Swiss-Prot record:
This is Fatty acid-binding protein 12. Keywords: Lipid-binding, Transport. InterPro entries: Calycin, Fatty_acid-bd, ILBP, Lipocln_cytosolic_FA-bd_dom. The lineage of its organism: Eukaryota, Metazoa, Chordata, Craniata, Vertebrata. It holds the Pfam family Lipocalin. It comes from Homo sapiens. GO terms for biological process: fatty acid transport. Coiled coil: none annotated. Belongs to the calycin superfamily. Fatty-acid binding protein (FABP) family. The keyword Transcription regulation does not apply. The keyword Transport applies. It comes from the Eukaryota. GO terms for cellular component: cytosol; nucleus.
Amino acid sequence: MIDQLQGTWKSISCENSEDYMKELGIGRASRKLGRLAKPTVTISTDGDVITIKTKSIFKNNEISFKLGEEFEEITPGGHKTKSKVTLDKESLIQVQDWDGKETTITRKLVDGKMVVESTVNSVICTRTYEKVSSNSVSNS
């Protein structure tokens, strides 16, 4: 499953980002910039370490982790979280915990596109990406 997600992906659509960012407590000005962002995501592996790099005009973010192991992360929204990523048959599932809140980010392939569903409380933001490159993404 992780092999299929490796590569570089560009955002082609986003649904419900305003409500999602508001639920996260992100301010109005940052939400406005966030709505304009069309991020590019690169997923790569080096042995058992997975790296996800997200780049946009608004912010860049990079996380590296091993499946099932907790790690600290500072989100693009500025939250310091305890995060854990697991893999099931269909999805890469990331759970972020901070200040008594929990966010779940699910990455999966649907018809050759990467669909990322981010959920906080009952608010879901869905962003769809298309693959632009699968070159030079694995160092293992």
